[in-house]
Every structure is written in structure tokens, then in C-alpha cells.
Amino acid sequence: MSGPCSAHRVPPIGPRPTIRSPRITRSSRMTEPKRPSRRGTTRTRPAPDSVGDDNPYLDAPASRASSESRSESGSGLSAEGSGSDAPRPRRPRQPRRPAADAESAPTAADTNDSAPAPTARRGVRRTTRSAAAGTDVSSSTSELPRAESPRSEPRTESRPEPRAENGSETRHESRGGSSEGRPSFRDPSPSGYEASMERPLADRPDAPNRYDRAFDRTDGPERQDTRPERPFQQERPFQQDRQDRHERQDRPDRRDRNGRRRGRGGRPDNRGPGGDRHQSTGPAADRSHDRGPDRNNERAFDRPERPDRQGESSDRFDSQDRGGNRQRNGRRGRNRFRRGAGGNESAPISGSHAPSQGSPSAPIGVEGTMAGWFDPSRDGGFLRRPENSYLPDPTDPFMPPALVRLHQLRRGDRLEVTYGRDHRGRYLVIEVQTLNDGSPVVLEKRPDFNTLVASYPDRKLTLETGRPAKTGPELTRRAIDLIAPIGYGQRALIVAPARAGKTTLLQAIVEGVSINHPEAVLLVLLVDERPEEVSEMITWGYGEVVASSFDMPPKRHVEVAEMTLERARRLVEQGKDVVIVLDSITRLARAHNTVDRGTGRTMSGGLDATAMQKPKAFFGSARMIAPQHGGGSLTIIATALVETGSRMDDVIFEEFKGTGNCEIKLDRSLADRRIFPAFDIATSGTRREEKLYRPDQLEKVHLLRRGLHQLPPQAGMEWLIKRIAATTNNDSLLDGL
């Protein structure tokens, strides 16, 4: 057999050394012809030129590799021999040679001992393959019998050393497919060491090529003898995790993320739907083919295993079966959405947020019964007690929203309820027994107070009691009935300077209403008054006293007044007569000016422009309801302070001056002379008083008033007091004129 390979054989000299891979420098590697591009091409094996057809095991790649090795060793044979201009074909897989063959084969490494140390890994690998090919050719040409097939040779000592050759073979086979006469990387019938490498990937043909590269990489020949072999038979947990990830790439919510994914080193990751990487183009693809075969292999085995991620991937895959719920469990079973263990929505919630089992929702027992006024809140309401002036207290029982809706409760309704305690120890209303001293069912269709039609009073509130009137309250009551009579639904304003006797006047009115008109509901409202006057009024025992003394905050004054007004409105809706005695409306307006949120526009005296809205609404609620509209009345007798030296008090009085239909003015000069009652007869009076007097009394009252106007205020009041003390009642006084 003739050819360049057989003509340039070098006989062995001396003892036969072991086969060593030749080492070349960067300059020698630069002379190597450029490898053709492998992108999108189908590689074919060209016919051998220099080797005869009778040796099928020797092909052009081996011949060319041998000639390259001889040209680099300085033998004089040109590298441009046969087949140098043809495209570089795929190299055959070089089997591990037994020790006997290695001793009989000539070596080409002796001629290259003077070559410098390798500077790059690519040159080392190519030279190694060339030298191996040249050695095989020389040995095959020296022996007339053909060499045995690589598949028939036993691989008995291939454990610690074949990493470079196997790595290069695996790399070429995984990229370009298998050539004729040798099995591919995914050959279903491998044997020995190759079978152990290919078994996990053969079981999963759609596994990503990332693992192919991980098994192919190496760090060069210096690690071939020191690194022990790692088992490939068992499948690692992270491989199963990555397989599950690729199986879920067809989900709609993952497509955008795959499109934006980047590979290692900033290169785009071109994995397809099945996990296989598309064939890359450009210089990045060439660099990826020239990368060290075992680099990824080292990283894959040096990276610590994460056994907990296998459960994580299975949990994510199982989440697709729960109606598309895309919950993502964290590592070690942590759930991002804080559901049950393993992400199950139906798992019971544990911890401090879990509802207590068997906790009672109803009161434990009945504590007793109580009466109070209903004060609504956002959810339900509370029952305010009279001993606290119907103000909030921690012991007030709570009214459930169901009872509020059932009985259509409104603020100010008087209730008698049965209450108990819930599981937290709070007071809770169990049952409503009475509503406004009647059945709760009867009051379901009551009218609204704002829809009631107001009219002038036509029924007189007689204050005269028939008691001796030498001095004291009876004298005051009889004087009021003659000068400024008060009727049901009257809006009376008592204009009183300081120390003019307004408190005594109010006490006389309260006593007369309580004695003469017990059917009327009397409410005494004391706002910002002296505590001793509050105590005296309560001790007196006439009417129901609701008070807030001056040592209380302004907010309490406002709350007390609003609750009292709402209570009076609820009674009027039922057709009852209510009388409110307020002391004083000036202090109430001051409290609203302090508490309410103003607009920033102030009148003289520092009074806000909107501070008088609620006090006016309070005073304007007094009205008499005609019988055809349901009847009932609300009478308000309020005091207004004047001559206090405060400009604000004067402005408040001017605001109320034209709102009342009855006005009683007290004279400070008469009070200084100890003349009581100190009425200013000329400025006191009642509008539409003809509706309150009998026809026979009306003319006599006009005659009396004309006579009193002719006298000075002091003399006229002194004369009237003497006439009242001389008579037993007003009828006898008028008859004596």
C-alpha cells in the first residue's frame, strides 16, 4: 500500500515509550487551515485520496491529520497533500488502544519534545486528535492484516483517562449527528462506558442540549488523570426540575419570558418549545463550538445539589390542575399567598388568624332590663342612660344592627330592653320590650318630623297654679300669663341680662308646666351653666333634667343638646306635646362656634358665619302641629344673654331676635332695685296672642296693657305686682279693671 502516510513512517528507536500527545504553540496552530463553518450544512465524508480503497477504516481525516502532524514535526512533508483543499470532514471516533498496541505503534511525540508548552486548549485538542490519527494510520499501514474495528476492542482501562477523546467525540456527535459506520451519541444500543453516559438522555429524548454540553466539557489533559469519574446513571433532582420547566414552556404566561430570556455570558437563549436549542448563526455560534468541552461538565458536577427544588417543581406543575391558579410556592414549601400547606386553598388556616372554634355568638346570659335613649352608630348603636345625661359611657349596651332594622329605630327613641353580655364581656341588647312607652310594632309607620306642618299656637300653656302669690314663683307665673302668654308649640325667647332673675323665672315656668300640664313631656336642658344650679334643678324634681355644666368641654354641650332635640322630635312624631326649657341658647351657640368646622368667614365678635346654623335649627324646631296633620307640639323656651360686655353675645341675640314668636325681656334696673319679676312690659309680648285668650279676656288684657304703657317701666311693674298680690287669680284681676 502506498501513500504519504506509509512513505513517511519513522521506525521506533530504543525502548518504546508510552504514547504522549504532541504539544504545539500558538504559532503552529495559526498555520492550521481554518475549519469550515458547520452552520446549516450536511456533512459528508469525502473519499480518501492517499489511502487505498481496500482499507475502509482509514479515511481522509486520519490521513490529513497524520500529514499535519508530520509537517508540524519538521519532517519536510507538506501539509498540502492530498485532501488538503477539500472541506474538512468529520473525524472518526478513536478507540482506546490497548497497551500492546501502544508499545508496537510508532510515536510522533519524540520528534516534538522540543515544542513549547500549550498556550490554548483548542490547539491541544486538535493536535491530540491529529497525533492519534497519525499513529493509527502508521500502525495500520505497517501491518498487512487490517486493524480490528474499534467496537470490537474491549474498553477495560478506560475509566480514568478517556475524558478528552470521549468529550470531543460527544461534542461532535451532539452537534452534527452521527457518521456512517459509528453510532451517534443517542444510539439506542451503546455498550460499556458510552452506555452509562447515554442512558439518562436516551430515556428523555426531548431533554435540552444544555446537559449535552455539561457532559462534554473538560479542562484539558492535565486533569484527565486526577479527576475521578462521576456516575451518570442516576438522574439528579435538578435535572428533573429543569425538565419540568421546559415542559411548561408552552403555557401562555411563560412565552413572553422565554422570548426575553438571555443565555449564559449575555448570549440569547435560542431554546425552542421542546427544549432543544436552535442552530445558532454568527460568530457567537462558532465560539460556542470551540469552547472547552468539559467546562460545563465541571460546573455541572461542582455545583451543589438542591434536593428541595424537586418538590418545588412538582408543586408548580400540579398547580395547573387547580383551575389555572398560578400560585408559586417558594423553596422549602413556602407559599407566597399564605394558603394552606402545599398551596392548597382548602387547607385550614392556622395561627393567630384562625377563627376560634365554638366561640359563642350570642350573650352568655341575661343581666337585666334597662331604659334609655337610642344613639345610632355606623353599625348598630348604643343605649344611652339618663344618669349620664345620655352621653357615651363604656357600660352602655350595644344595639345589634338586626334589631335596629327590625324596629326602624331612630336617634332619640326611648327603649326598654333586656340586655346581657357576649363572649367578650360586652353589654349587648337581647330584646326590645317597649319603644317610646308603647309597642314596637305600632311605631313602624310613624311620620318624619321634617314633614310635619307648623302653625301658630292656639292652645295656651296656663302657668297659674292657684297658689298664694304674695311673693315667689306664683307671682311670676301670673305676670307671664297677663303680659306674654305661652302656648303649645311656642318659640319663646327670654332676653335676660346678667343677674336679672332668669333662673328664678325658668324655675317658675317649669313648676307651672309640671303642675298644670302633666300630659306634656317636660325636658330641662342646661348648657354651660353653674353646677349648683344643675343640682338644684335636679333636686327640685320637675321634669327631666339633661345638663352639661360649664366645666365640661364644648363638645359635650353640643352632644347633649342634639340628643335632647332628637328625643323631643321622636315624641312629636307620635303626636305628643313636648316642652323644652333651655338655658341658655347663647352658650349653645358659643359651643357650636368652637366645635364646628368653620368656613373662615367671621362676623363681628369672632362668630363664624356658619356657627349659627345648628342653634337656629334647634330653636326653629319649635312648632305646633295641626290636628289634621297628626297633632302634637314642641315648645321651646330659651334664654338669650344680653348686656354681658361681649360682642359675640350681642350678635347671637340679634340672630335670634326675629326668630321667636314670644319674647320676654328682663330689665336690669328693676332687678337692681329688687323688683321681681323684672319685666320690661313695653318690649315683652306674644305674636298672635288673640289665639291664646278667650274673647272676653282679650279686651280686658288690651285695656291693662294700655294703662301700663302710660306709666314708667318701674312704676308700671310695681303697680302690676301689687294688683297680682291683691287678687287670687288673673280672672278676678281683669274683672276689677
UniProtKB/Swiss-Prot annotation:
Bias-annotated ranges (Polar residues): 347-360
InterPro entries per the UniProt record, alphabetical: AAA+_ATPase, ATPase_F1/V1/A1_a/bsu_nucl-bd, NA-bd_OB-fold, P-loop_NTPase, Rho_factor_ATP-bd, Rho_RNA-bd, Term_rho
Keywords recorded for this protein, A-Z: ATP-binding, Helicase, Hydrolase, Nucleotide-binding, RNA-binding, Transcription, Transcription regulation, Transcription termination
Comp. bias intervals (Low complexity): 16-28, 62-86, 101-111
MF-aspect GO terms: ATP binding; ATP hydrolysis activity; ATP-dependent activity, acting on RNA; helicase activity; RNA binding
Start and end residues of each Rho RNA-BD domain: 367-439
Compositional bias per record (Basic residues), positions renumbered to this chain: 328-339
Database matches in HAMAP family: Rho
Family to which this protein belongs: Belongs to the Rho family.
Protein name as it appears in the record: Transcription termination factor Rho
Source organism: Gemmatimonas aurantiaca (strain DSM 14586 / JCM 11422 / NBRC 100505 / T-27)
Lineage: Bacteria, Pseudomonadati, Gemmatimonadota, Gemmatimonadia, Gemmatimonadales
This protein's encoding gene: rho
